[in-house]
UniProtKB/Swiss-Prot annotation:
Source organism, top-level taxon: Eukaryota
Pfam families attached to this UniProt entry: PBP_GOBP
Gene name per UniProt: Gp-9
Biological source species: Solenopsis nigella gensterblumi
UniProt name for this protein: Pheromone-binding protein Gp-9
Gene Ontology cellular-component annotations: extracellular space
First-listed, main subcellular location of the protein, grouped into a coarse class: secreted
Function: Colony queen number, a major feature of social organization, is associated with worker genotype for Gp-9. Colonies are headed by either a single reproductive queen (monogyne form) or multiple queens (polygyne form). Differences in worker Gp-9 genotypes between social forms may cause differences in workers' abilities to recognize queens and regulate their numbers.
Signal peptide: 1-19
Amino acid sequence: MKTLILHICIFALVAFASASRDSAKKIGSQYDNYETCLTELSVTEDELFSIGEVTSGQHKTNHEDTELHKNGCVMQCMLEKDGLMTGADYDEEKMREDYIKETGAQPGDQRVEALNACMQETKDLEDKCDKSLILVACVLAAEAVLADSSEGA
């Protein structure tokens, strides 16, 4: 079963490297619990942000707070079902392990360092949905920057 590291996504948190290349895909759509979380939260796929929107930061300026929260709750649901989060708390070690497994990154890799930085940046946020979306957005944005810099090298 694939896990979301924001997907991390996003976690997702998340074959993020490959998912971020397909900017039209919805965040989290490649993971096993995607449909389950949409159903449980009464969210339609049309309400979810695309990976491109999140990577570029457009999700923060083009959408209402309720849409941001809804998207975050879907991310949190998937993270929790994959055992990466309980409520608003991350299992940081499991996130790292699953991220390394999904991406093939190694400890010390810039992608793992980006995940660590994103977890650190969001660790004190109390709202589990907001925290999840911000984490996924942070990881996706970092991966996009790293992919751009490696393509330019």
